[in-house]
Amino acid sequence: VTTIAFDPYSDAQRDDPYPAYAEARRHSPVTKLPNGDYAVARYEDVSYVLRHPELFSSTAMMRAMTNVFGSAEGAAKLTPSELARIAQLMERMPKLGEMMAARNMIASDPPVHGPMRNLVNRGFTPRRMAHLETRVREIARASLAEIERKPEFDIVSDFFVPLPVTVIAELLGVEHERKEDFKHWSDCAVAGATGGAGAMGPVDVVEGFTGLSQYLTEIVEKRRRDPQDDLISTLIRAEEGETALTPLEVVMFVSVLLVAGNETTTNLLGNTLIALMQHPDELARVRRDPDRIPAVVEEGLRYDGPIQFLFRQARQDVELAGVKIPAGAIVLPLLGSANRDDAQFPHADRFDPSRNTQGHLAFGLGIHFCLGASLARLEARIALEELLPRFAAFERVEPHVKYVDSYLVRGPKRLPLRAQTSL
C-alpha cells in the first residue's frame, strides 16, 4: 500500500485539489491515508465502490454528518468553557444522540434504503419539478433585480445562496423568510463534516445543529396537527409498515434534505461561473447561444463539482486496484478525481461544454444517486438563463477565490463582482 501526504485541512488541497488527485490516479489509485482511511482516485474504481453497496456500506456517511471534533485530539483541545457550553446544548436536546442514530436515506443500505428513498421520491416527481420551474424563475428574477441596483455585489450571498435556499424551504414547507438561518445551519453542517476546520469551531457546529433540530421539531409537530401540501407533511403521512418514520426520523430526514438542497446548487453555480469567467470564449459562446446552458451545467458538474467525495465502509476484506482494504476500513470514493480521469473523459482537465459528459459522478452513482439531481439541474439552468443576459460583462473584484472551509464540499465562499448591466 502506498501512503502519500493527503491533508484535507491544508489550504492547498482545499483551494485546488486536482493536482493531488492526478498524482494519486497516476501513482496510487487506492491510497492509504495517514489516518488509516483509503482514498479511491480512478473513475473505474470509484464507480465500482458506488455500484457495490454489498461490499461498501453507506452507513459511513454518518461520519460526514457527525465529525464535529475531527478526532479525539481535536476534542481534547476544547477549553473547559467550550465543553461546558456543548454540555449545556446537549441538555437542551436530550434526544440528540437518538436523532443522530435515526434512519436516514444517505447513510443507509438495502433493504432499509429502498423504501425510504421511494418515500422521499414523492417530493421530487417530474410533475412537481415542472411546476417548480415557474417559481424558481420568479425567485431568480427577484434576486437579480436587487443585484442590479448595486455597483458591486457578491454573487454567492446575493444570488447563489438565496435561490436554492428559498426553493428547498418552500418544497419542504418551512419558512423561507428564515433563509439566513437555514444557510447558517447548512454552514454548520458543512463545518461539522470538516471536523471544525476554518473559522467555525465545534461549539458553533453543535449550536447550529441544535438550532436546526429544535426548529424542525416544532415544524414537524405543527404539520402533524395541520398537514399541508409539502414534503414534511408527505413524510409524516407515510403509510404504516416498514417505511413509517418516527418524528425524530422525519426531523433527521428534513435536516439532510435542507442542507443538501442548498449546498449543492450554491456551490455548483459558484464553481461553474468561475469556470466560465476563466474561459471567456466559452462564456461568449453561451451568451450567444443560451441553448448551450444545460451542457455548461453538466460540464460544470464534471469539471469542478460541489461534492468532492463520499464515505463508505468496507463490509469485508476487499481488494481494489491491487490494494487489500480490510473489513471495517473507511473508504473515500473521490468523485472530483474520477471526473478528471482522462481514461473516462479525454483531456479531462479542460473545461469543454461541448464534450460528452455522460457518466460523470458529480451526483454519485447507483442506489444513492442524488435524489435532488433534477432539482439542482433545474435551478442551475434557470439561474444562468436569467443571470447571463442581464449583465454584459463581469469583473472579479478580488483576484483570488476563497473557498468554503471544507474538504468535502467545494465552492467559493464569496465571489464579489463588478458587472455591466445589459441595455
Spans of features found by a protein language model:
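Cytochrome P450
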Residues: V1-L423
